[in-house]
């Protein structure tokens, strides 16, 4: 394969109206790759650093000209002339140039933009779809979608503490059918909310953001919507939560302030709260049930629920192999959420997923609340045979872009395509 001859970064706009980095990579044999970098709202403190300008006169300080300049100057100088197929070498060279543990000098948004665009250019030069280039010939597993249909927490302006209430169409026979089932429940939920006089405006990730009386009320209306769409809750469709509990954790007291419900819970009480929800509703997965720093709380939760449901570490692990290794050794959680911009290169992303899978942890490939039309994560989910993807609701084109790419991939794979439904939770008893 040929070498990289041109790299160009630019500032574009994400789904929240904030700037982000987009990178184009060209090879000497005509390969081309373009990638846009996502951005999170609720972020883990140990995530790789997203470089913002801080100039209040542009985009309220959120401009990314510094990161774009890094792409077009110092990073380009290192990467130009390198073999486009040398993903590990390119990523390692950029990490070394940055020289920090969290990519804070040049910005994870700059480094990731190049990392993803390089992979796309290499795939283009090989005349292969990205999932096949990254995953090889055995790539065939389509993911079960986690579809965020009610938004709360940092993703919405309402009184619901839990950030995401999701559905997982586990009884579907294909990813395309799962997407259809999710769309039907989404439209059914809109009718249910309207019938109750509730708001049907959507949050950052396309889910509805109604003012509900409690977190449990959100689960009740979702179950009602599933039934109204003609499906059986718990049999056809499971529920999943992203609590994003760092957003309601009180570091001074060590307690969890569910302000929407007017309750303050200790670690033990929060575990009991989750156990009660799991007993009452067909919940198969809980993400970030405890704060990223509250490993004692995570241990309590894993001991109580780790054999029954998927316990996903997002802010807990931040797609970082070193932190994940510590979690595995301590028996914390049983799944990792994978966000490419938390770590900043494709190489490190793949390393984290491979480590998780070797340890019997599941991996959920995820979007961020600030997204673009870039659908790279759909290809990554298939390339890694991850079996699960979390990429928002059935509205907003930045979310739909990923679902449509999965539909195309499944069609392209034809009879080779696999969709495993409940089997993706291979570590539950």
UniProtKB/Swiss-Prot annotation:
Residues binding (2R)-2-phosphoglycerate, per UniProt: 163, 339, 368-369, 390
CDD domains reported for this sequence: enolase
Cofactor(s) for this UniProt protein: Mg(2+)
GO molecular function, one term: phosphopyruvate hydratase activity
Keywords: Cytoplasm, Glycolysis, Lyase, Magnesium, Metal-binding, Secreted
Main location: cytoplasm
Ligand binding (Mg(2+)): 242, 287, 314
Catalytic EC class: lyase
Pfam families named among the record's database cross-references: Enolase_C, Enolase_N
Reactions mediated catalytically: (2R)-2-phosphoglycerate = phosphoenolpyruvate + H2O
The enzyme's E.C. designation: 4.2.1.11
GO cellular-component term (any): cell surface
Record keyword Magnesium present: yes
Pathway: Carbohydrate degradation; glycolysis; pyruvate from D-glyceraldehyde 3-phosphate: step 4/5
Cofactor note: Binds a second Mg(2+) ion via substrate during catalysis.
Subcellular location: Cytoplasm; Secreted; Cell surface
Family membership noted in the UniProt record: Belongs to the enolase family.
NCBIfam families noted in UniProt: eno (TIGR01060)
Cited HAMAP family: Enolase
Protein name: Enolase
Species, as recorded: Magnetococcus marinus (strain ATCC BAA-1437 / JCM 17883 / MC-1)
